[in-house]
């Protein structure tokens, strides 16, 4: 989209590097070298009044003094110099600046709100402080101090941690996985996660997004940007700092269950480990989408398949039986021993032909949303030939193919062949199932986004005068909380019916609690779950963000202990959840 605020960071025609020098260990010098090694085609301008050259290029004392026009600047100089450098950028007409100073908190203290406002008035946006920088492989732009170059691809990586970015980039290089862009936001004194996500959403090179979050600094912007991005392409979020500790960023944290509820309302899905984020990245990079949660498994090993089945049950992934046509093809081509249902067991002595027959039959079955091919390195199995067969089957197949090749040295050439062909491959059964689960949950969340809660009382608006009178009367009495009767009057003034709530008797009723709690980050959150006596042993509390309707409430209940309790329980009939 022309004119987006990320253009200066992703499409610069020229880059200035402040602080660049040829001194050994120079932070800015490493950034300049990365830009040169990556083959950046535009002008590179080292800015350093104390050096004549850097990286074989002439240094200028300042951009204003040089009169050169620059789109993007990288500020990798000492923290005490940052205010002057930001003002030099603003005066020279720079549109984007990465504050990559390695001075940590000192840099954050120097880049004050007043300095940010001054830069913004000049049309300059700041990324950082503490930002690793920006990588745009298709433009040969590596404006970071990270070693190595990144392959171009369709996956965006957006992170609050530069260290995690470098970790993921190193992991991706081993698997020949490319990126559309890599951007570390740092301390977000100006450009924040939400604004970055809005830019990523409309980036034509990006088909999937990996997002690492430690704390949400501007909740409204974050949720808005995340919702826009997740509406257009899958977004998988990994959040650290779920529990307080010495490394937890300062400021309000908010409850992790509320963060989960917020993600569900944006359409994004959540990973809980770096391994899961890697797995999601492998699948998102293919651009595959799924229509549901129906998975077929083809395997030559019973034990690992049982692990995959356990994880599928935990994630709500279904394994429906094969169709009659698929069953006929399997019966004709496979030995009678082993399962011809789902999972399909080709047996441990299966060669490439038998294995490929089963995988191909499942890929053609319209009853599946994806096929997982699992392979253990048993004696007769030639892994590389198996990988070549899988690559041929995946090419042009109507259904996504995932591979799980278990083992080490014997399997490595097969893994490399699959990576070159763009077939997502996973080291363990659980990760393969989890990767598919991310796409299945993404589809579910997108469907839930279409649910728009309707008015509680059609045809009538709120009685604001009555509500105001209730509140003013209570305040006049010196009350800090509304008693039951005024509280009911207040709710009824807004069209919320209040029914009597007798204690369930006779063993047939269920008691639930509903509470609205203000989260310090995301605001009002609805907590609900089991009420009454704790004898059930179920203490689960579910959380959702308003507004809600019946469909969204039922979606929050799915798979929960509360849902199980509302079904037939200890002789009591199923609760009337439709009410």
Predicted regions: what they are:
Residues 1-579:
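Catalytic-core regions of core metabolic enzymes
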């Amino acid at each position: 989209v022309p004119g987006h605020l990320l253009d200066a960071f992703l499409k610069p025609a020229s880059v200035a590097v402040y602080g660049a020098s040829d001194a050994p260990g120079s932070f800015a010098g490493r950034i300049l070298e990365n830009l040169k090694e990556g083959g950046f085609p535009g002008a590179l301008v080292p800015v350093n009044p104390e050096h004549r050259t850097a990286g074989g290029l002439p240094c200028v004392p300042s951009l204003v003094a040089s009169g050169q026009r620059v789109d993007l600047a990288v500020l990798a100089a000492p923290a005490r110099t940052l205010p002057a450098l930001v003002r030099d950028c603003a005066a020279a007409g720079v549109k984007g600046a990465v504050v990559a100073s390695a001075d940590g908190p000192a840099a954050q203290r120097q880049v004050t709100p007043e300095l940010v406002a001054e830069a913004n008035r000049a049309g300059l946006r700041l990324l950082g402080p503490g930002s690793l920088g920006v990588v745009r492989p298709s433009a040969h732009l590596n404006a970071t101090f990270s070693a190595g170059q990144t392959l171009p691809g369709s996956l965006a990586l957006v992170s609050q941690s530069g260290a995690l970015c470098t970790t993921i980039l190193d992991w991706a290089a081993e698997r020949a996985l490319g990126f559309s862009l890599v951007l570390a936001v740092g301390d977000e004194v100006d450009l924040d996660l939400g604004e970055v996500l809005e830019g990523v959403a409309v980036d034509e090179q990006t088909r999937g997004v990996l997002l690492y979050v430690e704390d949400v600094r501007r909740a409204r912007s974050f949720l808005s940007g995340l919702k826009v991005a997740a509406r257009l392409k899958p977004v998988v979020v990994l959040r650290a700092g779920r529990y307080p500790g010495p490394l937890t960023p300062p400021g309000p944290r908010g409850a992790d269950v509320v963060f989960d509820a917020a993600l569900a309302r944006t359409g994004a899905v959540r990973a809980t480990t770096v391994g899961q984020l890697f797995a999601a990245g492998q699948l998102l990079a293919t651009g595959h989408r799924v229509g549901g949660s129906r998975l077929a498994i083809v395997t030559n090993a019973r034990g690992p398949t049982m692990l995959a089945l356990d994880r599928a049950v935990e994630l709500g992934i279904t394994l429906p039986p094969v169709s009659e046509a698929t069953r006929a093809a399997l019966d004709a081509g496979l030995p009678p021993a082993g399962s011809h249902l789902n999972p399909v067991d080709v047996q441990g002595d299966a060669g490439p032909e038998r294995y490929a027959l089963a995988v191909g039959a499942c890929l053609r079955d319209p009853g599946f949303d994806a096929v997982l091919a699992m392979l253990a390195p048993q004696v007769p199995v030639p892994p590389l030939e198996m990988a070549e067969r899988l690559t041929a089957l995946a090419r042009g197949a109507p259904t996504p193919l995932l591979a799980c090749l278990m083992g080490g040295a014997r399997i490595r050439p097969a893994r490399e062949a699959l990576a070159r062909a763009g077939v997502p491959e996973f080291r363990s059964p659980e990760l393969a199932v989890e990767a598919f689960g991310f796409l299945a949950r993404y589809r579910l969340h997108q469907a839930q986004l279409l649910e728009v809660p309707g008015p509680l009382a059609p045809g009538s608006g709120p009685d604001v005068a009555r509500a105001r009178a209730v509140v003013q009367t209570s305040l006049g009495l010196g009350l800090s909380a509304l008693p039951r009767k005024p509280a009911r009057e207040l709710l009824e003034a807004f069209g919320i019916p209040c029914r009597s709530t007798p204690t369930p008797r006779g063993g047939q009723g269920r008691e639930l609690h509903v509470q609205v709690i203000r989260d310090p980050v995301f605001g009002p959150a609805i907590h609900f779950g089991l009420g009454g006596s704790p004898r059930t042993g179920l203490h689960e509390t579910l959380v959702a963000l308003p507004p809600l309707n019946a469909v969204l409430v039922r979606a929050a209940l799915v798979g929960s202990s509360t849902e199980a309790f509302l079904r037939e329980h200890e002789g009591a009939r199923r609760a009337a959840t439709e009410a």
